[in-house]
Amino acid sequence: MSTRDLPHSFSELSYGWVKRIRAEFTVGKSKEQLLAEDYHSTTDEDSEVVTSVKANSLWPAFASGAGLFSDGYVNNSISTVLFCLKKIYPDEITKSNAINNIASIAFVGTVVGQLGFGYISDRIARKGGMMAANVMLIFFTLMCAVGSWGVTVQGFFACLTVWRFFLGVAIGAEYPTSSVIASEFANQLPPGKRNRYFSWFTNAMIDSGFVVSAFVPFVLIWIFTEKHLRALWRVAIGLGVIPPLSLFFMRLKMKNSSSFQKLHMKNVKYRDYPWWLIVKFYWFRLTIVSLIWFIYDFSAYSFGNFNTIIIGEIIPEAPIWKQWGWSIVFNLFYIPGAFLGAISADYIGPRLTLALGVGIQGVIGIAMSACLNSLKKHIAGFVVVFGIFTTFGEFGPGDNIGLLASKTSATAIRGQYYGIAAAIGKIGAFVGTWVFPAIQSKYANNANPDLQLQVPFYISSALCLFSACLAIFFCPQVGQDAIYKEDHDFVQYLSNNGFDINMLGEGGDVREVCRESDSLEKGKRDDFQVDNNSL
């Protein structure tokens, strides 16, 4: 089983992915077919067959996933903070690395939060980890807004850097807790609807946070004017407290998912924890998912550079409010991709949607780089092409990389699996923040000034095409019933390799899981029929 995801022949590598498509496509399948297939995949004899999306089924997935709105808002608000600090302290900024430290320390904190809370989510408390992340997000956002002071300017920078680190930890903590919980509750929705709601409640929330974080400073600049930037940046980031504070009370009413209650490893002692079995079972697919996430975040940095190019061409030396107005326009391009990519993931599967989106994005990126000089002369066309390009980024990896991470892992280790993949992605973003400026500086004095942006974009676009190939040829199939199947396969693997599965969950639940899964494989429920009147 340690090589279960590896292609075992050239023909399997070349054509095996075609066979996997059938399990992922829902196009042309009736609701009855989807329900029947899902029933044959469920591991709980007493579980209710859900035939429609209801509000009481949606709110747990929303309450857990919507916390990522705050992550998008607070994370993106730092760009407003840095912009204001450069205006307020121009001399001090040039004499220190304060701005770089404030920007970079967030990556470190986020990685710490993703890895640390991934472990907490699986081994200590999944809901408890989410609540702790929620409280941290509220507190450290508030500290960044009102608790950042210093006797000297450099002391103020140091204070803000410290709070920014812990805010990064809180942001990172949301990924392996709230996203994982959202995926488990979304899995309780009817087949054919699960992927879209997970993506809407996670990635679309992050993108909405980006848009709002661009809009709020635009409004505040009219209220405070450019003479009061100190108040502006503190209010802008402080408003990020409101969403997690409101969600906190919704989350208090939540319970862990039924699958986590049955399959968690909280009761397994450290010395008995099957570390090596888990590594052998998941090493390959985790490597592929993490690599795709690394490339996506790594490339996103260079793609963002085009914002500066377009703004500089349209409104050179423009006032702050105009620059921030255009930032709203660019951030709005995320929304269509996030909305449509989620729907596509339910029809053709997250794996193929990711490959399609990132592949088209790579092609458009290469074309934009090749035609950069002429595009700069037609700004309206440039904005439209760039918008389409950005939309496909969210349509593909933006919506589906988290979906892949959550559906290619078993419930018992999903927090750690998701946290590791997300952390490697964030490391990719950090590497991009250092690599691409170095590449740009190398071509700064070149006879062809366009190379300064073309070369990084060629590199990123090529990596996009590479990640599309990884998704098509090496990612496992991810159907509507992927979580059910993965839980069964993982428990069966542990049992076959000598691990006492009675330590999973709350005792006897796991025996029921195995018994029901085995009976499904033997076809004991082939006589199941869906009552058409209930559909």
Curated annotation (Swiss-Prot):
Its main location: membrane. The chain crosses the membrane at residues 49-69, 101-121, 137-157, 165-185, 204-224, 232-252, 275-295, 324-344, 352-372, 378-398, 419-439, 455-475. Disulfide bonds: none annotated. Gene3D superfamilies: MFS general substrate transporter like domains (1.20.1250.20). Glycans are attached at residues 75, 256, 532. GO terms for biological process: carboxylic acid transport; glycerophosphodiester transmembrane transport. It is a multi-pass membrane protein. It catalyses: sn-glycerol 3-phosphocholine(out) = sn-glycerol 3-phosphocholine(in). The keyword Membrane applies. Signal peptide: none annotated. This is Major glycerophosphoinositol permease GIT3. It comes from Candida albicans (strain SC5314 / ATCC MYA-2876) (Yeast).
